Amino acid sequence: MAFSERTRAARPLSDTTLAYFPDARFAPSDRDRAARVRCTYQCSHTRSWRAVAVSDNDSRYGHIPVMLDRCYELLAPALTADSTDGSGAVLVDATLGAGGHTEHFLTMLPGLTVIGLDRDTNALDIARSRLAPFGTRFVGVHTRYDGLADALDGLGYRTTSSVDGVLFDLGVSSMQLDQAERGFAYSVDAPLDMRMNAQDELTAADILNTYSAVELSRVLSRFGEERFARRIADEIVRRRANEPFTRSGQLVELLYATIPAATRRTGGHPAKRTFQALRIAVNAELESLATAIPAAMAALRPGGRVAVMAYQSLEDKIVKAEFAAATASRSPIDLPVELPGDAPEFTAITRGAERANDEEIEVNPRSAPVRLRAVERVADRRNA
């Protein structure tokens, strides 16, 4: 869709946000800019709109939950199947962060229990403080999302058919971006860390200073889809022979010098793909996701739902493939009837990937690249 004008976003944006989303300061909208700030959500395949106010609590914690109402709409039918207030239902927030999504679910459904997972101890502490008013209805667990099955087992739940909903909000959080010392942002000079869990050993500096040129090139190409991966890798190896990489500024300077000027002018920030690749490698994000999605689907009771928000194509490809396999029939394609036991155990409840609309992007630039997909587990036909 083309827009005839570009207007400024309704609130100031941090340098780190602009570094990851450089177009965020120009959010197209035909709405009245004097109106009170609101978020709206639109399914990319429908014309229905819904508006909600942005919570002051979200602003206080430096993070506005993405597609909040739409996530609730998708998961609520599973959470209220037995009771309208969610009594007896269990939701796993596999990427707890500041707890914005969880707070909304606990507020809307006063009988619901939420298990929140996060690898970042700082985020977990913030969420526990924020969600303390909900008492025992919230349980926080320090683990990556691929530790979902172990977390359930440790809390006394079965690892299969025991929960009613699972929510994933993938990628780096706004809180992490805004903490310069974490090293996620390339707009400020900071230590080359990038660990989401400070207890992990591997850092971005370790990768830059110890991987061979071939290994570096593979990381940049696979996780960053960087066209100039080998050129960058060779230059990293050459420079580190004289001085090890310790600061993000060193790497950004190298990237400006290595990536051709024509690409720098048209391809976005030259550091974007390299920083993404290093972050994914440091935190084993794709490997974790490939384990976590099947575990989440296995944990669902019949009628349970899982919703996943992905922010870049590598994540979305994994989610799309897992959901496609789960919703496909195993019967031969030329048979006129479904064979017993071959019907899919899941059905799609989003038509492809849903997107945030322009008004939400104006208020919350982090929502611009999001892709939201959801599936529901149907009755186990093998036992029917």
UniProtKB/Swiss-Prot annotation:
SUPFAM superfamilies given in the database record: Putative methyltransferase TM0872, insert domain (SSF81799), S-adenosyl-L-methionine-dependent methyltransferases (SSF53335)
Subcellular location: Cytoplasm
Primary residence: cytoplasm
Protein species of origin: Mycobacteroides abscessus (strain ATCC 19977 / DSM 44196 / CCUG 20993 / CIP 104536 / JCM 13569 / NCTC 13031 / TMC 1543 / L948) (Mycobacterium abscessus)
Disulfide bond residue pairs: none
Positions of S-adenosyl-L-methionine binding: 99-101, 118, 145, 169, 176
Pfam families: Methyltransf_5 (PF01795)
A molecular function GO annotation: rRNA (cytosine-N4-)-methyltransferase activity
Domain of life per record: Bacteria
Alphabetically ordered keywords of this record: Cytoplasm, Methyltransferase, rRNA processing, S-adenosyl-L-methionine, Transferase
EC assignment: 2.1.1.199
InterPro entries xref list: RsmH (IPR002903), SAM-dep_MeTrfase_MraW_recog (IPR023397), SAM-dependent_MTases_sf (IPR029063)
GO CC annotation: cytoplasm
Entry function: Specifically methylates the N4 position of cytidine in position 1402 (C1402) of 16S rRNA.
Stated family: Belongs to the methyltransferase superfamily. RsmH family.
Protein name per its UniProtKB record: Ribosomal RNA small subunit methyltransferase H
Gene Ontology biological process terms, A to Z: rRNA base methylation
Catalytic activities: cytidine(1402) in 16S rRNA + S-adenosyl-L-methionine = N(4)-methylcytidine(1402) in 16S rRNA + S-adenosyl-L-homocysteine + H(+)
Name of the encoding gene: rsmH
Organism placement in taxonomy: Bacteria, Bacillati, Actinomycetota, Actinomycetes, Mycobacteriales
